[in-house]
């Protein structure tokens, strides 16, 4: 097959070979005929690159702004601290809004090329990170890409980054069920990759967030992705002065607990809206060693996650 046109819908799309962008493409007859479609060669490359990565965990959210990237960072920090003999990687596939370089304190770092591929940026002795944020000329640069180009970038991150031996790779995704999700699932749901991908879904207590979380759960079920559980973020506000908690987002329909019962998925736990966490996210500081209600709740969530892998 020759190189696809710029706005190619992708060889696995139901519209492959049928949309206007396909007109004149030398591969149109192949893509439009289901009997002639070829397996994406990227799948074999991804399987080879991830052969030493034991577990893959998608961090998902149906709604934007629920703190999915923050939860990804907190999970990574706590797991790395509590399991110093294990190695963890973070892959930021929120192509248009990469947050992990800021959250993990790696803004301004550069990705280096070696004989075995891109070297992810080291965060701690047992944590590394890859993000498109490291490839931009400025943190303010906008990424204006259509689906096929995002798909190509994700394939590169999965197949051309030298992840080495990892016990867990956490993938921070954009909200919704968009091109990025379909791409990463198509590459990770592969019989050649052991211990295939699982998912954690992040929400807040109010119904406007839970509506989209239900869609995300159904997406996982349709794609055959096991759901480790749901994390309810910003479940309450913890005052930094008196330590008392109050509801910011009222759970008028029962919050994540009721939704998990309804959808038959586990509730991993709840995290409060803590000013210390907000400050740490802006500075890239690790505060998981502190003793407070937030880190205690985080510890319980991480224990349930690790138990699910065992």
Curated annotation (Swiss-Prot):
GO cellular component labels = cytosol
Q: Which InterPro entries match?
A: Mrp/NBP35_ATP-bd (IPR019591), NUBP1/Nbp35 (IPR028601), P-loop_NTPase (IPR027417), YlxH/NBP35 (IPR033756)
Give the principal location in a single coarse category.
cytoplasm
Q: How is the cofactor bound?
A: Binds 4 [4Fe-4S] clusters per heterotetramer. Contains two stable clusters in the N-termini of Nubp1 and two labile, bridging clusters between subunits of the Nubp1-Nubp2 heterotetramer.
Instruction: State any single GO MF term.
Output: iron-sulfur cluster binding
Q: Where does ATP bind?
A: 62-69
Q: Where in the cell is it found?
A: Cytoplasm
User: A Pfam family for this UniProt protein?
Assistant: ParA
The source's domain of life comes to Eukaryota
Q: Which cofactors are named for this entry?
A: [4Fe-4S] cluster
Q: Which CDD domains match?
A: Mrp_NBP35
Q: Which GO terms describe its biological process?
A: iron-sulfur cluster assembly
Ordered alphabetically, the record's keywords are: 4Fe-4S, ATP-binding, Cytoplasm, Iron, Iron-sulfur, Metal-binding, Nucleotide-binding
The residues the record assigns to binding [4Fe-4S] cluster 1 are: 8, 22, 25, 31
Which sequence ranges are marked TM in the entry? none
- Residues that bind [4Fe-4S] cluster 2: 239, 242
Family statement drawn from the similarity comment of this UniProt entry? Belongs to the Mrp/NBP35 ATP-binding proteins family. NUBP1/NBP35 subfamily.
Self-association and partners:
Heterotetramer of 2 Nubp1 and 2 Nubp2 chains.
General function of this protein: Component of the cytosolic iron-sulfur (Fe/S) protein assembly (CIA) machinery. Required for maturation of extramitochondrial Fe-S proteins. The Nubp1-Nubp2 heterotetramer forms a Fe-S scaffold complex, mediating the de novo assembly of an Fe-S cluster and its transfer to target apoproteins.
The identity of this protein, by name, is Cytosolic Fe-S cluster assembly factor Nubp1 homolog
